Amino acid sequence: TAFVMGELLPFIQKQFGKTINGKKAFAGFSLGGLTAFDIAWHHSDIFDLVGVFSGSFWWRKKDLSKDYTDDDRILHEMVRETPDRPNLQFWLMTGTEDETADRNQNFIIVSIDDTVDVIKELMKKGYERPKDIFYYEMVGGKHNVPTWGQVLPKFLEWAFAK
């Protein structure tokens, strides 16, 4: 966070000087998506939009084998426990082939389950679909750069063509 807020953003501001449509977005892939969400959530005075591609929303406080429950997912808890509602909009993406893990044996892969659960937590805070939350599930999409590269233009259009 210190690097993004103290070095990267000032560098971008110096190099480019303005925003597109007056909006600032922070996006990332996989663990970078989790990080983008976390940083934007805690700095909604700076960021307006969050993009998460195949986000590592499974990140948890304890191992699956040690009495794990879905309440142990760190980002879900952060959203749930934050008293206010940051002024943000969210673009969330998963691929149907991001992985094969099915933690709860419901025939839905973990990345989709966890992302849908993030959406549910956001909606409990008062965010609305599609006004505040856009979810894109790419059929055949994998957890890799070629997939994310294919959907990046969709995110950029959502974020900046408004």
Task: Enumerate the language-model features and the residues they cover.
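Non-catalytic cap/lid and distal C-terminal segments of serine-dependent acyl enzymes
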Residues: 1-162
